[in-house]
Amino acid sequence: SDREAEVIRIPTSAILQEEENMYVLVELGNNDYRKQKIETGHTEDGKTVVLSGLNVGDEIVVTGAFYLLDAR
C-alpha cells in the first residue's frame, strides 16, 4: 500500500530520550540544529520506525548526538 511505502526508519542510535519523550536532532545547515520531538514505532535490526515528527528528506544527526546536544 502507499502507506507502507512512506514508512520512515532511522538508526535507533539517533534517538535521544528525555523522560518519556523521544527526540532527534534535525540538521538545519550552517552547523545549526533543531531538537525535534518524534513518535516511534517498533525497532528492528537497529532501526526504529518514526510514526510522526519527521519528513522524508530531513537530515538528522546519527552519531554523537548526545555530545552535540551537550555542547550547545
Language model segments and positions:
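Exposed loop and linker-edge segments at protein-protein interfaces
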Residues: 9, 37, 47-72
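Residue-level recognition of beta-strand microenvironments
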Residues: 15-18, 40-43, 53
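Short aromatic-glycine-enriched beta-strand elements
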Residues: 21-23, 48
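ATP/adenylate-binding site constellation spanning eukaryotic-like Ser/Thr protein kinases
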Residues: 12, 21, 65
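Amphipathic alpha-helical segments that mediate coupling or scaffolding at interfaces
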Residues: 13, 27, 39-41, 71
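Short edge beta-strand segments in beta-sheet-rich domains
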Residues: 10, 19, 33-35
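Hydrophobic alpha-helix/coiled-coil detector that fires on Leu/Ile/Phe-packed helical surfaces
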Residues: 1-6, 15-16, 26-32, 44, ...
